[in-house]
């Protein structure tokens, strides 16, 4: 999981999603992903991708705030 986390954070930096974005933008993205998760749950669909998308956005917010998974 640690290596995957590092790769996701690198992906964010490579696409300027840390310096070129804001916490507000990322929280709005997280809420969008939560809506997709809610829709999947209500429809009885698989939620693995929705949860993964939320984790990616949360890792972005954590990186912006200087918080690690160990914290």
Regions picked out by a protein language model, each given a short descriptive name:
Residues 1-71:
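Flexible "arm" and connector segments at domain edges
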């Amino acid at each position: 999981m640690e290596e995957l986390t590092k790769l996701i954070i690198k992906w964010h930096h490579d696409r300027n999603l840390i310096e070129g974005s804001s916490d507000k933008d990322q929280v709005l993205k997280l809420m969008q992903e939560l809506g997709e998760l809610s829709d999947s749950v209500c429809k009885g669909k698989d939620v693995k991708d929705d949860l993964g998308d939320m984790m990616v956005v949360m890792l972005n917010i954590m990186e912006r705030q200087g918080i690690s998974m160990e914290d």
